[in-house]
């Protein structure tokens, strides 16, 4: 699946960064891999480069994100956020981070910019990887909880030695989410949701 965007992620990220003072901008660029290298730096590495603690870097990062969200540039990027919201919705409302990024671009620098835009934007929410699920983005908390709960239930009801063919697994999973909007109850989206875990 390849999704064409009506905006340029690198230009949008650059515009959002203009709302920041130089040091905050540099920290965000390093933290999210928005510079010449798409490699992200850890809080610790950035702290050592600036001679400050990891916690201070985290505070600067959080302040910078809030500054961007209150800026004129953020408001001007509304169409960007709306488009990403529609994409996530079309992919099921909750989607594995790497699948979302790969569907838009394979370029690591572009993916870093998209990740940054998602972090900054409303109504995007990210859940960290855990023992049950991969990193994922969602726009509706209730839907995300419903899907994750149904996936846990599906896997709990499978026996370790049980082989289940994909169509049967999809059918069973869809029976667990009968109260989810019809727009999401497709085989393609069910497969995408099964990929969350």
Give the ranges of each region predicted by the language model:
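C-terminal non-catalytic scaffold/interaction domains in large multidomain proteins
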Residues: 1-197
């Amino acid at each position: 699946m390849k999704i064409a965007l009506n905006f340029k992620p690198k230009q949008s990220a650059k515009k959002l960064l203009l709302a920041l003072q130089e040091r905050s901008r540099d920290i965000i660029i390093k933290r999210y891999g928005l510079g010449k290298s798409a490699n992200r730096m850890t809080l610790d590495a950035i702290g050592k480069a600036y001679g400050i603690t990891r916690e201070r870097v985290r505070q600067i990062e959080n302040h910078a994100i809030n500054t961007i969200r209150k800026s004129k540039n953020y408001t001007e990027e509304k169409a960007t956020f709306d488009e990403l919201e529609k994409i996530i919705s079309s992919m099921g409302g909750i989607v594995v981070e790497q699948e979302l990024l790969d569907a838009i671009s394979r370029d690591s620098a572009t993916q870093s910019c998209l990740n940054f835009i998602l972090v900054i934007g409303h109504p995007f929410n990210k859940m960290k990887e855990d023992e049950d699920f991969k990193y994922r983005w969602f726009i509706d908390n209730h839907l995300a909880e419903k899907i994750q709960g149904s996936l846990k239930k599906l896997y709990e009801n499978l026996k370790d030695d049980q082989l289940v063919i994909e169509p049967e697994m999809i059918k069973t999973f869809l029976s667990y989410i009968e109260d989810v909007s019809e727009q999401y109850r497709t085989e393609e989206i069910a497969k995408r949701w099964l990929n969350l875990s």
